[in-house]
Amino acid sequence: MDGMRTGTKTRSLKKYEATSEAGGHDRGDPPLALFSPFGPLIAQAEVPPDFVGRINSYADKRVRADASSEFLLPEDVVFDGGERSLMRQTENLIRRYLRLTDEPTAAKIRVDVFWVVSQYAGTSSPVHFHSGDVSGVLYLKVPQLDRENEELQKTYISGRQAGYINFLIGGKQRFSKSLVSFKPRVGDFYIFPGWLLHGAEPFRGVGERRSLAFNAYVDVA
């Protein structure tokens, strides 16, 4: 009987959640998958392993094995790699992102800060927004989930604990989706408006969920 109630509840809640399928693509380097399930544009790029590895080589020395933590990235890590550095690649993605919106051409992009978030089982990032014009999240490590199939039968609203990132806007409105969720994958780099509400749900499992985030400001021509 409980199982029937849970299944019915999950089906009824599903109608408020958009699918995580890309609505379009930009074929630059790296390619961008584009998501606009409820108005604001979400772009997702897949960066190469060596790009992730450069950041992880620094982060591995800073994370705690027994507790969640956050720390800023220093300039030498941010600019390591020249034109293939974290800073240059992030600026490039932001410029391409802006061209795909209705914003004028960016005259100047200023990335204010990069930071790393390290989290373990049971830890969430409550829904929040950022202070910049454009923000992003890059996944550096993902955990091994327990009872993954069971968790994926649920939604964010019904208490899923699979570590997904969730983007939300508005509330319950007719003819409109309210949220979209993405499963973290190493190398996935999401770009989105800094004001867009988002959060990471907790997960059950072994290992670390590690991500990089940034805030950037844009001056238009």
Residue ranges and their predicted role:
Residues 200-211:
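Ligand-binding loop in jelly-roll beta-barrel domains
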Residues 44, 135-137, 211-213:
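Beta-strand secondary-structure signal
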Residues 113-191, 208:
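Catalytic core of non-heme Fe(II) oxygenases with the double-stranded beta-helix
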Residues 123-124, 195-199:
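Histidine-centered metal-chelating micro-motifs
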Residues 215-221:
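Double-stranded beta-helix
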Residues 5-105, 113-125:
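Non-heme Fe(II)/2-oxoglutarate
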